Amino acid sequence: MDNVLLHAEGLCKTFALSKKQQKIEHTGAKKRVAVNHLSFDAMEGEIFGLLGPNGAGKTTTLRMLATLIKPDEGDAVIGGYSVQKEAEQVRRKIGFLTSELRLEEFFTPNYLFDFFSDLHQVPANLRKERKKHLFEIFG
């Protein structure tokens, strides 16, 4: 459990602001810094959360880690693979689900629990126990 699964070092991302955005935000700045030299480690088996107010760069950070956008500076290594140099291998190691995703009606919590249990080869007896426990907590 002491293994570093994700190592982020100096991640930076800026976005250009359109003239309309500059006017709305009453700024003359042509760029917005979304992520500014972010570094952290997440260990194998650890539950890790990114917390912060709206606009703090959480989603931008996750998009960089998921190789959906490239960092302007810095790099992250996930499972031994660089998000900058080995994006395809990183995508094979991770899954990324945003709140914007809309699932079909047949993707019920029960269906999704069974699907991911199958995917990760969770034994039937353990699956039943975990499902019962989690469904009691979350409904």
What are the residue ranges of the model-derived segments?
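Short hydrophobic beta-strand immediately N-terminal to the Walker A/P-loop
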Residues: 48-50, 62
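Conserved ABC transporter NBD signature motif
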Residues: 74-85, 90
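Short coil-to-helix segment of the ABC ATPase nucleotide-binding domain corresponding to the Q-loop/switch region
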Residues: 91-92, 106-114
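Walker A (P-loop) phosphate-binding loop of ABC-type ATPase nucleotide-binding domains
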Residues: 53-57
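Conserved ABC ATPase "signature" region
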Residues: 114, 118, 125-139
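Helix-to-loop junction immediately C-terminal to a conserved catalytic motif
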Residues: 66
